[in-house]
């Protein structure tokens, strides 16, 4: 199944992409099978947008072997934060700040895996962790 957030006119909705159509979902996108509406849009008539409205973006560092420089991977993940506007939608331009260009900062294009937590918790067991996710996005 392929889910998306999309803009149709001034409305923002969740939808399921089926072929060349987007079927609108109700607000409960976590369980799409029970939340499809009877409204559909041609994929060419909507704008696909960022999969989330980010508030807090927590990232994990040193998760690429090439970034470790021969050192062993850390035993405990090393989180850091990114600005909310670092998440963009399909086809949006990646804007490199002019200061980074002027200072010849090396940019590192990377594919990212986004895990959207839908259910809170504390001290969650590894075997139960996936049940707390509402969306996995690449």
Describe these PLM feature segments:
Residues 2-136:
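Active-site microenvironments in enzyme catalytic cores
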């Amino acid at each position: 199944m392929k889910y998306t957030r999309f803009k149709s006119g001034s409305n923002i909705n969740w939808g399921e992409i089926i072929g060349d159509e987007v079927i609108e979902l109700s607000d409960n996108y976590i369980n799409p099978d029970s939340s499809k509406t009877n409204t559909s849009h041609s994929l060419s008539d909507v704008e696909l947008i960022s999969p989330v409205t980010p508030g807090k973006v927590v990232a994990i560092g040193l998760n690429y072997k090439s970034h470790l420089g021969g050192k062993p991977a850390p035993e405990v993940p090393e989180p850091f934060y990114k600005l909310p506007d670092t998440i963009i939608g399909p086809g949006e331009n990646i804007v490199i700040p002019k200061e980074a260009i002027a200072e010849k900062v090396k940019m590192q294009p990377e594919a990212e895996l986004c895990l959207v937590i839908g259910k809170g918790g504390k001290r969650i067991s590894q075997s139960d962790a996936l049940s707390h996710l509402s969306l996995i996005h690449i």
